[in-house]
Amino acid sequence: MQKQIEIFTDGSCLGNPGAGGIGAVLRYKQHEKMLSKGYFKTTNNRMELRAVIEALNTLKEPCLITLYSDSQYMKNGITKWIFNWKKNNWKASSGKPVKNQDLWIALDESIQRHKINWQWVKGHAGHRENEICDELAKKGAENPTLEDMGYIEE
């Protein structure tokens, strides 16, 4: 029987681009694990994606996951847009390369062994776990220690 996990994620950026951070809360039964990391130069969308990737990569076995995020970009990308991107050799409908392709590929790889129910939550609306993730992401952004490998300045 696969473990049922709840994951809440958020990304933050001080300036866009600027220093960024990720926050995640993983819950299994009564156990909670919190993640917070900061990156020197990045974008908000990259942090939203990286928060999910980092959270999923902490899991040691395939799980049944309900994943909550306030990022429509991440949710629509992984549940709708990615299928055409992959078919079109990572080109957007405009014909231009998909932005943040490195992280979309990493996210696509990290979801393969799990069954995920994707849920959008309204940000800054009093959702307890989303508020915690927001704080964790801001903390990370305020104390960056990592390079966001793959970030390309526009």
Swiss-Prot record:
Gene3D superfamilies linked to this entry: Ribonuclease H-like superfamily/Ribonuclease H
Pfam family, one: RNase_H
Binding site for Mg(2+) 2: D10, D134
Catalytic reaction equation(s): Endonucleolytic cleavage to 5'-phosphomonoester
Cofactor note: Binds 1 Mg(2+) ion per subunit. May bind a second metal ion at a regulatory site, or after substrate binding.
A single MF term (Gene Ontology): magnesium ion binding
Entry's transmembrane regions: none
Domain RNase H type-1: residue ranges: 1-142
Stored SUPFAM superfamilies: Ribonuclease H-like
UniProt entry keywords in alphabetical sequence: Cytoplasm, Endonuclease, Hydrolase, Magnesium, Metal-binding, Nuclease
Database matches in CDD domains: RNase_HI_prokaryote_like
Cofactor(s) essential for the protein: Mg(2+)
GO biological process, one term: DNA replication, removal of RNA primer
GO CC, one annotated term: cytoplasm
Compartments (UniProt record): Cytoplasm
Main location: cytoplasm
Family membership: Belongs to the RNase H family.
Record note on quaternary structure: Monomer.
Protein name, entry field: Ribonuclease H
Lineage: Bacteria, Pseudomonadati, Pseudomonadota, Gammaproteobacteria, Pasteurellales
Gene (UniProt): rnhA
